[in-house]
Amino acid sequence: MTYCFDIDGTLCSNTEGKYDAAEPNREMIAEVNRLYSEGHTIVMHTARGSTTGLDWRDLTERQLGDWGVKYHALHMGKPTADLYVDDKAINVRDWQANRTDSPERKLDSEATDERRYR
């Protein structure tokens, strides 16, 4: 399976264009690395530089390396938009909550089990 991940606001903090100040999201990076280790194809896709025309590839590659992100390809030039509509899109928070090993999912299933046995 091929997974395509946004970078800012997904794998790191959203710094509103101050990319050198981005802080890694260690939980998401661990999940990406798990998928990579399972043999999935990991593609990074970012809008960095789309509005300014500046080339952020070197910084982005350095950050991904420093953060220990495992990936196969980096695509720059994602169009800038206020909202992306895509038949295969999922919000990062929803994706995290719906993983079978996520704490949120375990809490939901535990709550369901408790209600069932009352």
Where are the regions a protein language model picked out?
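Catalytic phosphate/metal-binding cores of nucleic-acid and nucleotide-processing enzymes, i.e., regions
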Residues: 1-118
